Each structure stands twice: as C-alpha cells, then as structure tokens.
C-alpha cells in the first residue's frame, strides 16, 4: 500500500536535507518527494515497430512544475 501524503512530505524533506551533504538519487511516484528535488529526470518508455525503448531526460524548471502537477492529479 504505500505511505500517506504527510509521511511522503516528511520523507521528501529528510531527503532534501540529506542532499545538502551528499548525492541522493530517488525513484518515486510521490509528488511530495519529487517536488523537493533540485534536478528532476523523467523516465519514460517509447514503443517502436521493433521494441520498447526506455529513455531518461532532465526536466527544465517549468517542465518539473508541470510534471509535479500531473503527478498530483493521478
């Protein structure tokens, strides 16, 4: 089942504080965690005629904001 919004917010804040002195790499579907990141990468899949490919790209600040809103609406 997962964690509640309040716990996710606390987790995000703890990770943000930890990131001040070390590198933190997090894979999450929680907008409360993703909202606190300094750099946001989007991992997505793309189907071709032959196979499914996985891609990753860094989001701009504006794209980050839009992705957080999209995550919140799910």
Briefly describe each language-model feature range.
Residues 6-74:
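C-terminal lobe/lid and adjacent interdomain/linker elements of RecA-like ASCE P-loop ATPase modules
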Residues 1-3:
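ABC ATPase nucleotide-binding domain "signature" loop
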């Amino acid at each position: 089942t997962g964690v509640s919004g309040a716990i996710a917010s606390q987790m995000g804040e703890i990770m943000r504080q930890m990131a001040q002195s070390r590198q933190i790499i997090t894979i999450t579907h929680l907008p409360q965690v993703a909202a606190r990141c300094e750099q946001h990468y989007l991992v997505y899949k793309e189907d071709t005629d032959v196979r499914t490919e996985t891609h990753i790209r860094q989001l701009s600040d504006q794209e980050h904001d839009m992705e957080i809103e999209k995550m919140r609406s799910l």
